[in-house]
Amino acid sequence: MSEKYVVTWDMFHMHARKLAERLLPASQWKGIIAVSRGGLFPAAVLARELGLRHVETVCIASYDHDQQGDLKVIHKAETDGEGFIVVDDLVDTGNTAREIRNMYPKAKFVTVFAKPAGAPLVDDYVIDIPQNTWIEQPWDLGIGFVPPLARK
């Protein structure tokens, strides 16, 4: 990936709330299926904003920090997805999204961020990201000392 897009907690929360607005009225939903791990964060925001208490997970391993590998389903919610929102932080190449679509064909699949290759596979998202851009999510970052410019 040649570019990086750094997301702060404030930005993420704002975008996740915007996604929640698009999912109203809340009465149409039975619950949320969060794609672990990136989808756990927007799932918490959606659950709060939509007043939903039923939150399931689907655990699919595909990344090792910035390298995408083979998909491995570790755990899946036992439903066809009817009445459920499936949420992930990002749709990138679409590999994970295709697997999720097969598992939950009746769910509404949403993400906060979408890259061009994966965007057609989700029902809704908030922010377009160029395909060659790596997203640094706030849960992957820490706060550290930065030396003054004069010391570099």
From Swiss-Prot:
Residue positions binding GMP: 92-96, 134-135
Zinc in keyword set: no
Gene Ontology CC: one annotated term: plasma membrane
Annotated binding of 5-phospho-alpha-D-ribose 1-diphosphate, by residue: 37-38, 88-96
Pathway: Purine metabolism; GMP biosynthesis via salvage pathway; GMP from guanine: step 1/1; Purine metabolism; XMP biosynthesis via salvage pathway; XMP from xanthine: step 1/1
InterPro entries reported in the protein's UniProt record: PRibTrfase_dom, PRTase-like, Xanthine_Guanine_PRibTrfase
Residues reported to bind guanine: 92, 135
One Pfam entry name: Pribosyltran
Residue ranges crossing the lipid bilayer per the database entry: none
Cofactor requirements of the protein: Mg(2+)
Cell location: Cell inner membrane
Topology versus the membrane: Peripheral membrane protein
Function of the protein: Purine salvage pathway enzyme that catalyzes the transfer of the ribosyl-5-phosphate group from 5-phospho-alpha-D-ribose 1-diphosphate (PRPP) to the N9 position of the 6-oxopurines guanine and xanthine to form the corresponding ribonucleotides GMP (guanosine 5'-monophosphate) and XMP (xanthosine 5'-monophosphate), with the release of PPi. To a lesser extent, also acts on hypoxanthine.
Quaternary context: Homotetramer.
Annotated family: Belongs to the purine/pyrimidine phosphoribosyltransferase family. XGPT subfamily.
Protein's recorded name: Xanthine-guanine phosphoribosyltransferase
Organism (species): Mannheimia succiniciproducens (strain KCTC 0769BP / MBEL55E)
Gene: gpt
